[in-house]
Amino acid sequence: MTSEATLKLMQWLSPAYPVGAFAYSHGLEGAVSEGHVRDGDTLSDWLSDLLTHGGARSDALLLACAYRTETAESLAEIDDTARAFCPSAERLQETDLQGAAFCRTTAAIWDTALPSLTYPVAVGHAARLNDVALDLTLNMYLHAFLSNLVAAGQRLLSLGQTEAQQRLNACGPQLRRTVDAALSGTIDDLFGASFAADIASMRHETQYSRIFRS
C-alpha cells in the first residue's frame, strides 16, 4: 500500500471530513442522562462493551464484509443487513446520514463512484476501490469511532483532556482484538448483545433536553 493510500484514509476518517460525526453520540448521551455512564471508569466500560458486543464490533465486521465483496448485489445485501441491524431509528439515521455524506464527498473529490451506503459499508467499499489495506482501515475506523465517543464524553461528563486520551489509549488492546475478529469473520458472525447501549439509543429519541442527534 502506498503512502498516498494511507493519507487518503487519514483524510476520510479525520474529524474535518464532512460526515457530521461530531453530532452523534451512539446513545452515549442517553446513557449519561440515565446515570449508566457517570465518569471516566464507566465510560471505559461502555466503550469496551461496544467493542466486544456492540456497535463498534458490528461496524468493523460490516466494513470488512463490504471490503471483501466482489459484486454490487452482495454489497447491497450487506448494506441492507447493516440497516436492518440498527436497533433504533436514531442509530439508523446515524449510519445512514454519515454514510451518504461520506459517499457524496468521496465521489466529488476522487471521482469514485459510490452508491449511497451506510457508513461502515461505504468506508469498506471505498477502501477496496482505492487499494487501502483492510487491516489499517479497520484499525483507523475503530479509532475514529472511539475518538468521537470520547470527545462526546468530554462534553457530557467531567472528563479532562488528559484523562480522555488515557481512556482512549486504554482501548487499544480490545480494539486490536475486534479488528482481528473482523478480519477472520463473515456476515454470519454478526451479532449484537450490548443491550444497555441499544436501549439508551431508543430512549434518547424522546429525551427532553439533548445536544446530540443520537
From Swiss-Prot:
InterPro entries: UreF, UreF_sf. Keywords: Chaperone, Cytoplasm, Nickel insertion. GO terms for cellular component: cytoplasm. Its main location: cytoplasm. The keyword Nucleus does not apply. Signal peptide: none annotated. The keyword Chaperone applies. It is found in: Cytoplasm. Required for maturation of urease via the functional incorporation of the urease nickel metallocenter. PANTHER family: UREASE ACCESSORY PROTEIN F (PTHR33620:SF1). This is Urease accessory protein UreF. It comes from Ruegeria sp. (strain TM1040). The gene is ureF.
